[in-house]
Swiss-Prot record:
Record function comment: Acts as a chaperone.
Gene assigned in the entry: dnaK
GO molecular function, one term: ATP binding
Protein name: Chaperone protein DnaK
Listed Gene3D superfamilies: 1.20.1270.10, 3.30.420.40, Actin, Chain A, domain 4 (3.90.640.10), Substrate Binding Domain Of DNAk, Chain A, domain 1 (2.60.34.10)
Modified residues (Phosphothreonine): 173
Keyword annotations of the record: ATP-binding, Chaperone, Nucleotide-binding, Phosphoprotein, Stress response
Any matching Pfam family: HSP70
Organism: Bacillus pumilus (strain SAFR-032)
Length: 613
């Protein structure tokens, strides 16, 4: 069975891992980094992904960041005259991760386990699965990030019974899960979170502070200047990271904008104490889901054996201090918070292929599921934190006499009224025989698969007629749309590969021109004019082809010149060999002459003991 890669598709950074020899291993990207920024940029039709896209984000308005925050919504971003959905942008990132995983493994990769925040609803999970499909990946399983982290942490501890709390503060989402580990079973007891809270928000409080301080000093609002704002964002992110290790950091942004008197610079010292003051509300916000998760699991903080921190933002000292205070436990720092989720996803891939034995993963649904009933009430069929896969049925009836159709309004959430919860979908069961209200028996069944994706069925018990849907959100893509996007993604991948080949061929051609010039210089006076002319003509022809940019022409001219250069190089080696031989012969002759000049001398051995007497 081919390898299944594990992908942590993050808001700010993504990571890919694979199981090798029973051990999960992070695959480094082309730049040698173990995580890749989740950033996509478009420039004159060319796509850039990762660090290269992030670096030019200040000057390129067609740069898309933190798209994960929009998954499962109808958000679209217009770039160079084309609208892109969050699924398509995520697919570009996934394609990039897939390509360098293939480069590392030396084989095609078609299957993946992708992680999502535990608190992602059905629409967000479905959108992630669609992104994988567009990228040419068969998504074998969608698993929750905290669960993946627990897998990576607990794989070598399966013989111990432990209750662990996973605190996962990523770039744009926040989750807490309580899990029980024992006998190879990873059972999620509860999960809670906030999909609109993450490291980006910690950056934002620093940005707001810088904007306010600069306005106070210079009377100019930098938040209205797009380019200045991007520089502020980069500086804020760096300052946040610095303050995890030092107590104060200098923020210096020369020529941030211009005033009446000329250019203005931003110079400011930010202390850790000030940063903690600015972000205190955010840290406190993370404590609510921690308490909720413990309550749902029916546990007190003292019953938690270990606290695991996941996500780069957990390096913030105030965050570590808050979780320590809340749970009374020193957070475990034995796992890399940036990589642990991808490692766990790779382990789950190994469970699917059978490479990892005796490990069972029992996940839960993060939100309650149900339907709207009379009076706009939300009637729950499946309570949150129910272990998945699961199914549940309940019988309902009509609300009016002679009602021949019922609307099934499927919802996800925790609020008592339907209007306050998230609509997953609607469908209709028709042709119900007319009868007084309350007589028809309508069975509504909910099924949640192992990926947390919902199927709903409604059946008229009297006629046996049924209607069912796999929930697609309002932003959900149809199969045709996905198919179209898959084709576009493949075409783009081909175009990207062609562009890469073009660059490589041009580089090789440029190198060959340089080699030719150097070889001709080294052979000056040692080869006849005709050979020199032949080489120069071929070199000029290749230069002209490079100027024109016709790939096939460059290849042909490069091959011609290559043959000539090989002949010249052979000649160069022959010349060098002749010279070396001549030197050797000259050296041997000189040694012989030196021998002829040697004079034999008589000598007498002196005995030290005799000398001393």
């Amino acid at each position: 069975m081919s390898k299944i890669i594990g992908i942590d598709l993050g808001t700010t950074n993504s990571c890919v891992a694979v199981l090798e020899g029973g051990e999960p291993k992070v695959i480094a990207n082309a730049e040698g980094a173990r995580t890749t920024p989740s950033v996509v940029a478009f420039k004159n039709g060319e796509r850039q992904v990762g660090e290269v896209a992030k670096r030019q984000s200040i000057t390129n308005p067609n740069t898309i960041m933190s798209v994960k925050r929009h998954m499962g919504t109808d958000y679209k971003v217009e770039v160079e005259g084309k609208n892109y959905t969050p699924q398509e942008i995520s697919a570009i990132i996934l394609q990039h991760l897939k390509s360098y995983a293939e480069g590392y493994l030396g084989e095609e990769v078609t299957k993946a386990v992708i992680t999502v925040p535990a608190y992602f609803n059905d629409a967000e999970r479905q959108a992630t699965k669609d992104a994988g499909k567009i990228a040419g990946l068969e998504v074998e399983r969608i698993i929750n990030e905290p669960t993946a982290a627990a897998l990576a942490y607990g794989l070598d501890k399966t013989d111990e019974d432990q209750t662990i709390l996973v605190y996962d503060l990523g770039g744009g989402t926040f989750d807490v899960s309580v899990l029980e580990l024992g006998d190879g079973v990873f059972e999620v007891r509860s999960t809670a979170g906030d999909n609109r809270l993450g490291g980006d928000d910690f950056d934002q409080v620093i940005i707001d502070h810088l904007v306010a301080e600069f306005k106070k000093e210079n009377g100019i609002d930098l938040s209205k200047d797009k380019m200045a704002l991007q520089r502020l964002k980069d500086a804020a992110e760096k300052a946040k990271k610095d303050l995890s290790g030092v107590s104060s950091t200098q923020i210096s942004l020369p020529f941030i904008t211009a005033g009446d008197a000329g250019p203005l610079h931003l110079e400011l010292t930010l202390t850790r104490a000030k940063f903690e003051e600015l972000s205190a509300d955010l840290v406190e916000r993370t404590m609510t889901p921690v308490r909720q998760s413990l309550k749902d699991a029916g546990l007190s903080a003292s019953e938690i054996d270990k606290v695991i921190l996941v996500g780069g933002s957990t390096r913030i000292p105030a965050v570590q201090e808050a979780i320590k205070k809340e749970t009374g436990k020193e957070p475990h720092k034995g796992v890399n918070p940036d990589e642990v989720v991808a490692l766990g996803a790779a382990i789950q891939g190994g469970v699917i292929t059978g490479d990892v034995k005796d490990v069972v993963l029992l996940d839960v649904t993060p939100l309650s599921l149900g339907i709207e009933t009379m009076g706009g009430v939300f009637t729950k069929l499946i309570e949150r934190n129910t272990t998945i896969p699961t199914s549940k049925s309940q019988v309902f009836s009509t609300a009016a006499d002679n009602q021949t159709a019922v609307d099934i309004h499927v919802l996800q959430g925790e609020r008592p009224m339907a209007a306050d919860n998230k609509t997953l979908g609607r469908f209709q069961l028709t042709d119900i025989p007319p009868a007084p209200r309350g007589v028809p028996q309508i069975e509504v069944s909910f099924d949640i698969d192992k990926n947390g994706i919902v199927n709903v069925r409604a059946k008229d018990m009297g006629t046996g007629k049924e209607q069912n849907i796999t929930i697609k959100s309002s932003s959900g893509l149809s199969d045709d749309e996905i198919e179209k996007m898959v084709k576009e993604a493949e075409e783009n991948a081909e175009a990207d590969a062609k562009k890469k080949e073009e660059i490589e061929v041009r580089n090789e051609a440029d190198q060959l021109v340089f080699t030719t010039e150097k070889t001709l210089k080294d052979l000056e006076g040692k080869i006849d004019e005709e050979q020199v002319k032949k080489a120069n003509d071929a070199k000029d022809a290749l230069k002209a082809a490079i100027e024109k940019g016709e790939l096939e022409d460059i290849k042909a001219k490069k091959d011609e010149l290559q043959t000539i250069v090989q002949e010249l190089t052979t000649k160069l080696y022959e010349e060098a060999a002749k010279q070396a031989q001549a030197q050797q012969e000259g050296g041997a002759e000189g040694a012989q002459k030196a021998d002829d000049n040697v004079v034999d001398a008589e000598y007498e051995e002196v005995n030290d003991d005799q000398e001393k007497k």
